[in-house]
Amino acid sequence: TERSRLFAAPSAPDSVAAWLRRYLEALKVRHANPINLAARRSQLARFNAWCVDAGIATPAEVTHAQLERFQRHLYYARKPNGEPYALNGQASVLANLQAFFRWMVRHQHLPSNPAADLDLPRTPSRLLREPLSLTEVEAVLALPDLAEPYGLRDRAILELFYATGIRRQELANLKVADIDTERGCLLVRQGKGRK
């Protein structure tokens, strides 16, 4: 996208883009999850594009008031289909900015963190209020067409989710060798938080 190209373009050593690239490199060196790193890169590229439009050249020029304006920009921004961005996405962008500015202060590149007291949007709880009933579980497990190969695959995926409670990315990372049929166990190589 245009935003990503702008982020990757050559820039002055003290520019927002240059510092964001250094920050992402520091995360990469610390073995950050590649999927999370890609998401952070996209979100920080969005902030960089906003800084370019706002005439903010360096991180030292960023103030708390400007970050509040960026937060309002996120709130009023629309997807290509005209829908607003989800609150969880807005909160994630702002949390990544807080982490970036915290890193800048920790490594003595800035004297203070302009994002320190930024109020993040309240996001609704995503947990189920109550677990699915046995009837509901059976109805979900009966959805795949077991006469089709994709149906068998989908049923196995649903069974794994239900029986183990693993996360979507953990399931996507599973290999056949991670299944111990003798003991009835799964080896989850990389769970949330690198666990």
Feature-to-residue mapping (PLM):
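Conserved catalytic core of the tyrosine transesterase superfamily
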Residues: 1-195
